[in-house]
Structure formats: structure tokens, C-alpha cells
């Protein structure tokens, strides 16, 4: 069953939300107007705008925003002529009044994210969003960490609370091919006609497009991506590449492939601080199953304490850290620094 009469699937571009991590949350109103204008003209149906960690994310722990996110949402709504504007919120970080304000500012899709075993904390937020007339989407973050049957049960909690589409969210970019299909299929089987299923991928193992296509084949009707891979870690599924692949496969997205390619190169790239690369740290994240937004934090702590960023991420993966535990990266870095100092002292003593 297609998403609608005109679209086989619906694509949401997260450049102005997930890309906030890569931009260190320094988006301006001008950035938003430029990117929304280009994506809207290319036919992208949904554009997500908030701090990288969602409503209320501007903080010492996650990083402070250059511009209040509600101002960015307003600018996006004012600029978009066809695209719907979505926002993300994490219960406990964002609060109910944030949802109301975003709705008042014209956003029409509320995306609520929880760790993939904690769907129950989203129930009241879905209820509020539906009462406000918002379309609702649920994110089961770090979906690689749980088997399909567990995710299906969590998806049921969200759907029963009023969520209209539940996403398998590969926050770490750690899922590989059939692991995506199995999880999406499990949600489709569980939810039936009660809610749609979506997929949010990252490029940390270089599989964003392939995983997204497999998700569609398994029944996903909504797919996330970011133009020019503008997202956390190695970035998200590149919308321009996904649009090209789906066009070749005869999957209707409503996106003009050539226009989105131009938008990626001419509009989005100049706003990025640098390309989102599949480098040592981002690849380590996918390999170790680490939350993608940890990348910049790990890199900063590695420089500050003179330790290996990759070792920080490997230990974060061993501890199975999740979003919200960024402070533990400092603890890990300090531990590595202490160990390095001790090893240096032993080596110097032996050589004396």
C-alpha cells in the first residue's frame, strides 16, 4: 500500500535538526530560510527543524543554540510553500509547553523520541499532540540494541497512545541490511493499519541508502534523510542519493532528483562547517554501536584530555550509553588520560 495516491513513500529531511549536531547547533534564521526554500522547491514533503536534541535541547549538556529554536521553526513555516514543518522532542528534555509553542508557530508534525525500550514515557505527549491537531511520529532510538520483537512491543505502546507512524531509528548507524528489514517487518506486522512504520538511518557504516531501500521493501512508508548527509556522525541517508535511487526503482517520493542535487551542492554545502565524513570516529561509532550525536563531544574531549577519540567511543559502546549520557564521555576521557599517565610513568621508570 503506498503512502498516498501521489507518493509511494514520504521523505522527511532532517538537515535542520540532525544537521544541528554537525553544525554545533549554530543555525541562524537565514540558514533556515535558505535551506527550507531550496528543499521546498525540490519537492521535499517534510522538513524537520529544531535543536539537534529536540525542543528544549539548548543546554550545557547538549550544546547551546545560536538562535532560539522556536524562531527557527517560525522562519521555516514562513518560508515553506508546500512542505510541512516537523519538530522533534524528547520527553523530559522538551516539555508539553514546548509542543504547544511549536504548534502555535505553525509546525504541523510532532516527532517524539524515546530510547527504544522506554516508549511508555511518550504516552502523554502523543495525547497532547493529537489534541492539538498535530500529526504524530514516534522514534524508537538506538533500535540496533534490541531485537525485532522487543521493538514491536514498544511500537504498540506508541501507536496505542496516538502515534500515527513509528520509526525504527538507527541512531548509531549500526544496523546492517537484513537487520533493518527484520525490524521494520516486525513493526509492520504488529501495527497493521493502526500506524505506519518509518526508518531513520545514519551513514556510520556507509549503508544509509541501502538500509532505507530495504526498509521500504519491508513496508516502511516514511523515510528520513538529510541533504548532503547533513547530520550527526557520518550523517544521515543523503536525500539526493536516495531520491536518485528511488527514481531508478520506480518508487515515487515527489522529490525532483536534479533539483535536490543542486540544493545539496549550492545551498546546503556552503552552510555546513564541513562535510559529514565516514572517517575514523564516525566509522567507530557504527562499529561500536554508539549514539551518533556523541561524535562532536568525543572529539572535543579527546583533544582536551589528550586521548584517543576512538577509544572514548569504543568504551561508550561497551557501556551501552544512550542519548542523554553525554556527560559520561568526560568520565571515560579522564579515565583514559589517567591510564595514559600511569603507563607513561611506568615506561619512564623502566628507562631510567
From Swiss-Prot:
<dbReference type="InterPro" id="IPR035685">
    <property type="entry name" value="DRE_TIM_HOA"/>
</dbReference>
<feature type="binding site">
    <location>
        <begin position="17"/>
        <end position="18"/>
    </location>
    <ligand>
        <name>substrate</name>
    </ligand>
</feature>
<feature type="binding site">
    <location>
        <position position="202"/>
    </location>
    <ligand>
        <name>Mn(2+)</name>
    </ligand>
</feature>
<keyword id="KW-0464">Manganese</keyword>
<dbReference type="GO" id="GO:0030145">
    <property type="term" value="F:manganese ion binding"/>
</dbReference>
<keyword id="KW-0479">Metal-binding</keyword>
<dbReference type="GO" id="GO:0008701">
    <property type="term" value="F:4-hydroxy-2-oxovalerate aldolase activity"/>
</dbReference>
<keyword id="KW-0456">Lyase</keyword>
<feature type="active site" description="Proton acceptor">
    <location>
        <position position="21"/>
    </location>
</feature>
<feature type="site" description="Transition state stabilizer">
    <location>
        <position position="17"/>
    </location>
</feature>
<feature type="binding site">
    <location>
        <position position="291"/>
    </location>
    <ligand>
        <name>substrate</name>
    </ligand>
</feature>
<dbReference type="GO" id="GO:0009056">
    <property type="term" value="P:catabolic process"/>
</dbReference>
<keyword id="KW-0058">Aromatic hydrocarbons catabolism</keyword>
<dbReference type="InterPro" id="IPR013785">
    <property type="entry name" value="Aldolase_TIM"/>
</dbReference>
<feature type="binding site">
    <location>
        <position position="200"/>
    </location>
    <ligand>
        <name>substrate</name>
    </ligand>
</feature>
<dbReference type="InterPro" id="IPR050073">
    <property type="entry name" value="2-IPM_HCS-like"/>
</dbReference>
<dbReference type="Pfam" id="PF07836">
    <property type="entry name" value="DmpG_comm"/>
</dbReference>
<protein>
    <recommendedName>
        <fullName>4-hydroxy-2-oxovalerate aldolase 5</fullName>
        <ecNumber>4.1.3.39</ecNumber>
    </recommendedName>
</protein>
<dbReference type="Pfam" id="PF00682">
    <property type="entry name" value="HMGL-like"/>
</dbReference>
<dbReference type="GO" id="GO:0003852">
    <property type="term" value="F:2-isopropylmalate synthase activity"/>
</dbReference>
<feature type="binding site">
    <location>
        <position position="18"/>
    </location>
    <ligand>
        <name>Mn(2+)</name>
    </ligand>
</feature>
<dbReference type="InterPro" id="IPR017629">
    <property type="entry name" value="4OH_2_O-val_aldolase"/>
</dbReference>
<dbReference type="GO" id="GO:0009098">
    <property type="term" value="P:L-leucine biosynthetic process"/>
</dbReference>
<feature type="binding site">
    <location>
        <position position="171"/>
    </location>
    <ligand>
        <name>substrate</name>
    </ligand>
</feature>
<feature type="binding site">
    <location>
        <position position="200"/>
    </location>
    <ligand>
        <name>Mn(2+)</name>
    </ligand>
</feature>
<dbReference type="InterPro" id="IPR000891">
    <property type="entry name" value="PYR_CT"/>
</dbReference>
<feature type="domain" description="Pyruvate carboxyltransferase">
    <location>
        <begin position="9"/>
        <end position="261"/>
    </location>
</feature>
<dbReference type="InterPro" id="IPR012425">
    <property type="entry name" value="DmpG_comm"/>
</dbReference>
<comment type="similarity">
    <text>Belongs to the 4-hydroxy-2-oxovalerate aldolase family.</text>
</comment>
Amino acid at each position: 500500500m503506498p503512502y498516498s495516491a501521489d507518493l509511494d513513500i514520504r521523505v522527511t529531511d532532517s538537515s535542520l535538526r540532525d544537521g544541528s549536531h554537525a553544525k554545533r547547533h549554530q543555525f541562524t534564521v537565514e540558514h533556515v530560510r535558505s535551506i527550507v526554500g531550496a528543499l521546498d522547491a525540490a519537492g521535499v514533503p517534510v522538513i524537520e527543524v529544531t535543536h539537534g536534541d529536540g525542543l528544549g535541547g539548548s543546554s550545557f549538556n547538549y550544546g547551546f543554540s545560536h538562535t532560539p529554536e522556536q524562531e527557527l521553526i517560525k522562519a521555516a513555516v514562513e518560508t515553506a510553500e508546500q512542505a510541512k514543518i516537523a519538530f522533534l522532542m524528547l520527553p523530559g528534555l522538551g516539555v508539553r509547553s514546548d509542543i504547544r509553542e511549536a504548534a502555535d508557530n505553525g509546525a504541523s508534525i510532532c516527532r517524539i523520541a524515546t530510547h527504544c525500550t522506554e516508549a511508555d514515557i511518550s504516552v502523554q505527549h502523543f495525547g497532547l499532540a493529537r489534541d492539538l491537531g498535530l500529526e504524530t511520529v514516534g522514534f524508537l532510538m538506538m533500535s540496533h540494541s534490541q531485537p525485532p520483537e522487543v521493538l514491536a512491543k514498544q511500537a504498540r505502546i506508541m501507536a496505542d497512545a496516538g502515534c500515527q507512524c513509528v520509526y525504527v531509528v538507527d541512531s548509531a548507524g549500526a544496523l546492517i541490511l537484513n537487520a533493518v528489514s527484520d525490524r521494520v517487518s516486525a513493526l509492520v506486522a504488529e501495527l497493521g493499519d493502526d500506524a505506519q512504520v518509518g526508518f531513520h538511518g545514519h551513514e556510520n557504516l556507509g549503508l544509509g541508502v541501502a538500509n532505507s531501500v530495504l526498509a521500504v521493501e519491508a513496508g516502511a512508508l516514511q523515510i528520513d534523510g538529510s541533504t548532503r548527509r547533513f547530520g550527526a556522525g557520518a550523517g544521515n541517508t543523503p536525500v539526493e542519493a536516495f531520491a536518485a535511487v528511488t527514481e531508478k526503482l520506480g518508487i515515487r517520493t515527489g522529490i525532483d532528483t536534479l533539483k535536490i542535487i543542486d540544493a545539496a551542492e549550492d545551498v546546503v554545502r556552503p552552510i555546513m562547517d564541513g562535510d559529514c565524513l565516514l572517517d575514523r570516529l564516525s566509522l567507530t561509532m557504527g562499529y561500536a554501536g554508539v549514539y551518533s550525536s556523541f561524535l562532536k563531544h568525543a572529539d572535543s574531549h579527546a583533544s582536551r584530555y589528550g586521548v584517543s577519540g576512538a577509544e572514548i567511543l569504543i568504551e561508550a559502546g561497551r557501556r551501552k550509553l544512550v542519548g542523554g549520557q553525554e556527560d559520561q564521555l568526560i568520565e571515560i576521557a579522564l579515565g583514559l588520560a589517567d591510564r595514559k599517565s600511569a603507563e607513561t610513568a611506568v615506561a619512564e621508570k623502566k628507562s631510567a
